[in-house]
Amino acid sequence: MGGVAAGTRWIHHVRRLSAAKVSTDALERGQSRVIDASLTLIRERAKLKAELLRALGGVKASACLLGVPLGHNSSFLQGPAFAPPRIREAIWCGSTNSSTEEGKELNDPRVLTDVGDVPIQEIRDCGVEDDRLMNVVSESVKTVMEEDPLRPLVLGGDHSISYPVVRAVSEKLGGPVDILHLDAHPDIYDAFEGNIYSHASSFARIMEGGYARRLLQVGIRSITKEGREQGKRFGVEQYEMRTFSKDREKLESLKLGEGVKGVYISVDVDCLDPAFAPGVSHIEPGGLSFRDVLNILHNLQGDVVAGDVVEFNPQRDTVDGMTAMVAAKLVRELTAKISK
Amino acid sequence: MGGVAAGTRWIHHVRRLSAAKVSTDALERGQSRVIDASLTLIRERAKLKAELLRALGGVKASACLLGVPLGHNSSFLQGPAFAPPRIREAIWCGSTNSSTEEGKELNDPRVLTDVGDVPIQEIRDCGVEDDRLMNVVSESVKTVMEEDPLRPLVLGGDHSISYPVVRAVSEKLGGPVDILHLDAHPDIYDAFEGNIYSHASSFARIMEGGYARRLLQVGIRSITKEGREQGKRFGVEQYEMRTFSKDREKLESLKLGEGVKGVYISVDVDCLDPAFAPGVSHIEPGGLSFRDVLNILHNLQGDVVAGDVVEFNPQRDTVDGMTAMVAAKLVRELTAKISK
Amino acid sequence: MGGVAAGTRWIHHVRRLSAAKVSTDALERGQSRVIDASLTLIRERAKLKAELLRALGGVKASACLLGVPLGHNSSFLQGPAFAPPRIREAIWCGSTNSSTEEGKELNDPRVLTDVGDVPIQEIRDCGVEDDRLMNVVSESVKTVMEEDPLRPLVLGGDHSISYPVVRAVSEKLGGPVDILHLDAHPDIYDAFEGNIYSHASSFARIMEGGYARRLLQVGIRSITKEGREQGKRFGVEQYEMRTFSKDREKLESLKLGEGVKGVYISVDVDCLDPAFAPGVSHIEPGGLSFRDVLNILHNLQGDVVAGDVVEFNPQRDTVDGMTAMVAAKLVRELTAKISK
Amino acid sequence: MGGVAAGTRWIHHVRRLSAAKVSTDALERGQSRVIDASLTLIRERAKLKAELLRALGGVKASACLLGVPLGHNSSFLQGPAFAPPRIREAIWCGSTNSSTEEGKELNDPRVLTDVGDVPIQEIRDCGVEDDRLMNVVSESVKTVMEEDPLRPLVLGGDHSISYPVVRAVSEKLGGPVDILHLDAHPDIYDAFEGNIYSHASSFARIMEGGYARRLLQVGIRSITKEGREQGKRFGVEQYEMRTFSKDREKLESLKLGEGVKGVYISVDVDCLDPAFAPGVSHIEPGGLSFRDVLNILHNLQGDVVAGDVVEFNPQRDTVDGMTAMVAAKLVRELTAKISK
Amino acid sequence: MGGVAAGTRWIHHVRRLSAAKVSTDALERGQSRVIDASLTLIRERAKLKAELLRALGGVKASACLLGVPLGHNSSFLQGPAFAPPRIREAIWCGSTNSSTEEGKELNDPRVLTDVGDVPIQEIRDCGVEDDRLMNVVSESVKTVMEEDPLRPLVLGGDHSISYPVVRAVSEKLGGPVDILHLDAHPDIYDAFEGNIYSHASSFARIMEGGYARRLLQVGIRSITKEGREQGKRFGVEQYEMRTFSKDREKLESLKLGEGVKGVYISVDVDCLDPAFAPGVSHIEPGGLSFRDVLNILHNLQGDVVAGDVVEFNPQRDTVDGMTAMVAAKLVRELTAKISK
Amino acid sequence: MGGVAAGTRWIHHVRRLSAAKVSTDALERGQSRVIDASLTLIRERAKLKAELLRALGGVKASACLLGVPLGHNSSFLQGPAFAPPRIREAIWCGSTNSSTEEGKELNDPRVLTDVGDVPIQEIRDCGVEDDRLMNVVSESVKTVMEEDPLRPLVLGGDHSISYPVVRAVSEKLGGPVDILHLDAHPDIYDAFEGNIYSHASSFARIMEGGYARRLLQVGIRSITKEGREQGKRFGVEQYEMRTFSKDREKLESLKLGEGVKGVYISVDVDCLDPAFAPGVSHIEPGGLSFRDVLNILHNLQGDVVAGDVVEFNPQRDTVDGMTAMVAAKLVRELTAKISK
């Protein structure tokens, strides 16, 4: 029951139709108008929020949520397309207070804003292909960055979205970033089942594009020979769980982003052991504890310019939404790293 | 854990800000731009889909899905805000075939199209109040009706959305409709806990506005004295479950909409007994079976100009999404009534 | 994981102790003091509630909840011991309104009061045996009936409690009653696995004791040869589900209780098909719908002097507590039959 | 997560191996030895059980369970491969008594025996293809029928198994049977996604083979144009749910099997509404109630020579196994029809 | 669906009634009689159990369970009111043996006794306000302590109960105690949403009252600025999870209670990471492992005079009751610390 | 709902029958034929697989799965009888890749083969007693070991199966092995509730038989006085969780099997904390993390000649089958230790 089946079928409809009676030109004009309207909606919200923040004053950087409900580049389950609204709900849910662990006040509007979701399903349902869709994601990210002091904190969606997001961040800032990538998998395969935009290939695309200087992968415990070879080829620093007890000290005192445009943090919720985050598509036992992740994030030194939290799959969560709370706390603590 | 808590908090932010340093004018201009962009996005998708349908030809009326993910006017739980994407997923899910029970082919693009969701949460999060929000819903419905041969089939959301939807349908067609309303509750209270837009009051607003000639309520089994008095006041035909075995024959041979602008069908998923539809906010035992509902719908005579399926709450569904399948089949069978 | 395992073990402790060093007399005195204190607590609550009702005036009969959290006489699962607080929660839960289907206002304190639970586990844990425990249940019921205008509406617990409850009702009123008994099973076996107080034997005890004139059993679909023979022996009117479509008309126009002390209604939640009430210990497909039960109850003529709702097992309910809502609605509609 | 993925992958291993270094002959000899051993195991158990029954005497026909844990011919989910042990557990589970509704004693060994499962996964894992696998199923059924007075009552598995089972029954008895087929779907498509053994095609195979004279399909509510055309082509009597209220009387007084070799009953658990049987792969609302099914079965006149209960999917059942109990009760009541 | 909604509504009834026709005096007399009966029931059980223990001889201190099913002072969910019977069930459940990890035999009646629950809901339902209710809790604790060698081990309920319990312990012993408090939250706010008895304020009340000399808080990871300031104001030793890896050694070798009346241990189940204890109202990732908690408890030196296990919420537990088993093991290991 | 209830009842049937009319001889002959056929089926599959492996060449040792679906020797729940097919499904499930953590390729047929399940239930259902059944398990293991290069990796079933498995391994190899036993319980009681084949006694049987030289037990946290005494009596090295932080270093550098016939690894899934493996019969908080287990296994030096993974109970697993994935990963990583 893929989350985007409707879109998938419509693409066929649209193709069939256009093959039959509608000119390609007319179709593409229609699609472009839909895409433009989508970006306009994000732009107007970013503008409004940023104006308000600037009126308040005293903010240097402020985390701004942008949802990318895209699940169709997953190899196994497509539920992450449903994640953004569930994460937002959990962020503001009354079961916890409004402070982060180190004392940032989320109730202060200068700390966290939101520009809503890129209308991914609506665009796909108009027959727009993946190349162009990935560009829409990139454009959306840039639209947010356009508005000072907003910095994009992206809610996935599957991990395929990290490629267009990091590309946009790097292009907008004018150079590569350092990436801290927490994940059970390296997501660095050349292509997965022929899909170059697969959620298992995003970091191959990022490294090929030169959007990152250093790439540190932490939490890895499902990796093939090709995954290790690609890691070497791109100079990736892969920290596997097998040796985490030895690497822990180093990982709890990272310093990143100097000499480049800053730090990007990409958190795949499955970096956590499934005991801590059961609501993921790929259950891979032997992962990090939630505290392990916080220890790494809290102690990281560097200017965090953007980030993402991806691969939370609400269709696999417990009935009480434990993983939604986990994803939300990750977003909250990342917000504390970004906003200042 | 209300589905729209984020929005709720932001409204306060926005008010605080505007009270402090931002002029009301500037804020309203920003909100208007966001609303305009939202409507533009729906318009562009409706245009594109309708153009394609018209190019195909031979269609007199075609059901067009419009999601309204609004849950904050509910008195108990707000999960219906998450329903539209789950219903879409279930409509196209591979577990069933593409024919309706009476043989309509949903794979034929002339039968069913989709213009996506009204970005309710994004608009609320900009501080837009309910009056204006309800207008946005109405405008969205009219935008769809603008494009021949599209007819709106709205995915809720809670039942408060039926008011702006029916209002739009009636205003656009230029006169009242007949309404078949399947529900456990009459939703006709003057106001609920002071909220005139409450999901328990939508049909009071509809009747006051003169948007309906006849209103038939079927499945009723949770009704107070006020509910029965309001029913009498507005001339509502209330069929309570207590007497369903006697009313069944009449309800399985309805003829509606003659002399007015057509028939509107509003299906609250909780019209069904919770055995058949556990994923609802208000579990009220003693309801209709799914077959009872189909027998009423299949045998209804009349020109169905629009409809809605509301109050499915995915946060209360079974782990297999049984109620999502139920909501989806309701949408499929309503599509068969609308499209021709 | 029996709900009363703690009690079971303590009984052994107490026996061992008393065998060893404590005189039987001393032990029994202690037990008696505990039992007296238990009954005093119920009496004081009944008195206070009844005083308030009488001060209000105009009440002829008022349903009064009495919980009997006893599960250890069940043959399969003992979860019904946890039911009473869950049913109370569901009765007052904000998801439904305060009117019964026929218009009784539960918010009116004259309609429904509550004297809490018999402290079954506490008493058993002091080493009190079943004979004496059953007497405590009977005494508790009589204590409630002592206070005009209270009529006991008992929340089980398993079905073994109907014996001491009906016995108390009959003894207090001074003669037999007619019983409407809704159940998947006849519960009329001479003894089950040697336990004469078994939940499968309560109606054998009732008939032997002469506490009932007529006993109508409806919903029966799990019955052995012995069950049918016992039925004949005691003159029970057994309506099996196999012939329900033929018996329906008769059962929807019952007139009971004339010439005796009134009508007692005992509802085993498993009379319903498990589709409507999954939270029961004995899943027996092929039962009544919730509407079938309401049709029988609403149309019953007779003076209902007391009743019970038993065998709801919260440990088998859905995560949303659907069966708790079902049990609560049964209690609400029975309240409407009793109070006047 | 297909229930037979292991087998699927091994088939590839075996093919690759055999392509490489192992002669086809050697491989086929090995496979044949495995198949022979499998059939021997069933034969020995059938022999032992039948000997014991014959020693007891007085039995004319006795239902004998045969599990066929095959799920790989399903189009959507493959969980039915896990069903047979779960159904057995539920049949003997202590939560219900040992009598069927009409008084057959299942504790009497003359009424119900069991020869275990065909080792489907083990055989497939040796690289055996579907043609041959279907023959193994047929041979297993014949092996049971070989032993008087055993009559096969087959536990699926998906619906694809009905073809080899009915074929075996008909071939063994020397002529066609009449089939009562309860299902949401007609399963009569020529082939499904190219698979002629698909669970959606079994009854096309049966009718083509001449194994049935009359085929009555009851509960149908998901059927395409092709399904109806195939129905006509083969002279199938299709009773759709749309008209069930009209057909009910006729279906509750069926007389079948006269002039042919007897009656075969095939019950797809999804003939029931998902409210009554949520544990199925294809949730199709609007089905029969459990009582509807029992009314049809109890009133059927005819000599039932064999039957099956298929498509129960334990991976979609409720946590309490409600559908397992439903499947088990179907088996119990079918046993009562067969044994005499 | 608050666990005490019934009580809440009744309070209104009682107030309305008393306003109208019943004298305040009469009402208060009735309430007092109910409270007296409640305390008598606890006293009689404590007496009986203590007599038996003393007859056995050789016991210096013995843990005695006292349930306090109070959930209405919670800010978010009120399910902890249902916890005590579930914890008792799990303590004696057959899935584990009767020894604690360090070898205490729970089957020895000298090690663990039980005086049942304070009838919180029954008392509230009579219109008794929180001030008086808290006194009833205190009196119940003192009643247990009256009977040598019983020491109270309290089963919550929400954390608001720790205030009246500690107060009673301190008053009864005649001086302050040292408190080891395991929790995700400091529960030391001056008042929460205006409620001075809130479960978020209990330790503010305790410190103000001078009932504790040292207060050590371990597991803290959701704390606001006010929480830290209150901590300083009262001289609380707050150990936050952020620094747990550094504090671990110190916390695994605590020595408490010297020079005061002993040690009190208060365990909020949410001190554990939700992976280990999902059944809590406030899911706060990043907590202690179960082994972390045991290491702290096993190595603690001091005379433990009383304790509590609070905030287990059965309505959020897994279907198998994992958190019930966790709460039960906490009770078992605390029992081993107390009894000697 | 015991997993083998059917079998249990049949045993009674068979006994009754044989007592009555069938000679013991005839019955035993029938049983022997069934047992022979069962072993033949395993032998033929082992032969075929081993032939193929030998044809491929270059394999010294290859893990070969053998399922033993036996649950009736459990003291609490019997669900482990359903485990083998669920573990197989999870091993090959598409959610993870085919490499083990240290790079073994499971897609290489030389690394992992499968001979299916011992038909335990079928044999028991023929009235075969436990003594003989245990011999069948032993014979099955030897049958696998007969075929070079296969080494048995057994899928339980409850822990009682380790006794016949280890016995077979030791007898076949001609001497004792060293055993690494990961478990929450020592399983070394003389007998449990009179059952010498209990899952709580298997290691007592193994030590008595001299099948092991060293026995290391890791993860122990539920142990009685008898358990510790039996440990001493047999010279078992018991590592309790209470001291795991101190023992960790030693356990992460084990060297076993020198001077004996090799190493046997027995993994009871409940060695893990229930947070990591909720799907077990005995929830015992305070266990190992999944990474702890992998660290011990990865660093173990020794020739692993066979192993088992037992006590996974699918009836207690999460709806997503998290524990199935955990059991499968244990099997995968053990495969990597065995195959070379």
Curated annotation (Swiss-Prot), chains A, B, C, D, E, F:
Subcellular compartments: Mitochondrion
Annotated residues for binding of substrate: 185-189, 193-195, 311
Highest taxon of source: Eukaryota
Pfam families named in the record: Arginase
Reaction(s) the record says it catalyses: L-arginine + H2O = urea + L-ornithine
UniProt-annotated binding residues for Mn(2+) 1: 159, 183, 187, 268
UniProt-listed CDD domains: Agmatinase-like_2
EC number: 3.5.3.1
Binding-site positions, Mn(2+) 2: 183, 185, 268, 270
GO MF annotations in UniProt: agmatinase activity; arginase activity; manganese ion binding
Major site of localization recorded for this protein: mitochondrion
Pathway info: Nitrogen metabolism; urea cycle; L-ornithine and urea from L-arginine: step 1/1
SUPFAM superfamilies membership: Arginase/deacetylase
Record keyword Hydrolase present: yes
Transit peptide (first-last residue): 1-24
GO CC terms: mitochondrion
Keywords for this protein: Arginine metabolism, Hydrolase, Manganese, Metal-binding, Mitochondrion, Transit peptide
Cofactor: record remark: Binds 2 manganese ions per subunit.
GO biological process: arginine catabolic process; putrescine biosynthetic process from arginine, via agmatine; urea cycle
Family: Belongs to the arginase family.
Entries under PANTHER family matching the protein: ARGINASE/AGMATINASE, GUANIDINO ACID HYDROLASE, MITOCHONDRIAL
Function summary: Catalyzes the hydrolysis of L-arginine to urea and L-ornithine. The latter can be utilized in the urea cycle or as a precursor for the synthesis of both polyamines and proline.
Protein name: Arginase 1, mitochondrial
Naturally occurring in which organism (per UniProt): Oryza sativa subsp. indica
